Design a protein with these regions (language model features):
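Hydrophobic, Leu/Ile/Phe/Ala-enriched alpha-helical segments that form helix-helix packing faces
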Residues: 5-17, 64-65, 111, 115-123
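Metal-dependent nuclease catalytic cores in nucleic-acid-processing enzymes
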Residues: 60-71
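C-terminal lobe/lid and adjacent interdomain/linker elements of RecA-like ASCE P-loop ATPase modules
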Residues: 95-167
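Flexible loop/turn segments at secondary-structure boundaries
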Residues: 43, 87-90, 136-139
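Conserved catalytic network of the ASCE P-loop NTPase/AAA+ motor domain
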Residues: 49, 71-74, 118-123
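Walker B catalytic acidic pair
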Residues: 83-85
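Conserved ABC ATPase signature
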Residues: 35-62
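Extended, charged coiled-coil "arm/hinge" scaffolds of SMC/Rad50-like chromosome-maintenance ATPases
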Residues: 1-41, 72-79, 91
Length: 167
């Protein structure tokens, strides 16, 4: 099982073009971390460098595990939520990432395309909920957007917060 999951993690890491993905990527079940198996030894996630790698390898691990759970019909909930998985691509706090010229938009696109492809390849057995500042204009991306929480529209309506403060 771990070899299957590791093969998928390696493929996904290469799709995202993560640093170190030219090597074999795997989960270390003893230390509960992602590691890269290089010719000179193993490199744990804690030594992989950038925030893009940290977030990317977490994403890869979750997607590979969920794919395995679906493929093997394991009793694991068939959804996963990613909150701001593209945060590493935006140099500052942004309200609307569409206006950020410094973002690595191709890396953002690869991340969301991987999520889309995993769901499609599993024939809808997995639901991915993503909340993010990124808002790609690609048709395939916009078709997956349920709600843009901007300009006063929010996951938790303001009047709910007002009601709570009076309790």
């Amino acid at each position: 099982a771990m070899d299957e999951i590791s093969d998928v993690m390696t493929d996904f890491a290469r799709t995202l073009q993560l640093e170190g993905s030219e090597n074999f990527v795997r989960l270390d079940p003893v230390d509960l971390t992602v590691v890269i198996q290089q010719p000179g030894g193993r490199v744990p996630l804690s030594r992989m460098g950038s925030a893009e790698n940290w977030v990317g390898y977490h994403l890869v691990a979750h997607l590979a595990l969920h794919r395995w759970f679906c493929d093997k019909d394991r009793p694991v909930p068939r959804f996963v939520m990613f909150d701001q998985s593209t945060q590493a691509f935006f140099p500052e706090e942004v309200v609307d990432a569409a206006d950020d010229e410094n973002a690595d938009w191709e890396a953002v696109r690869r991340q969301f395309a991987l999520m889309r492809d995993v769901v499609a390849n599993l024939d809808g057995q997995l639901q991915i909920i993503a909340s993010d500042h990124a808002n790609l204009q690609d048709d395939w991306f916009q078709e997956g957007v349920i709600e843009n929480w901007r300009n006063g529209v929010a996951l938790i309506p303001e009047d709910w917060l007002d009601e709570q403060s009076s309790i």
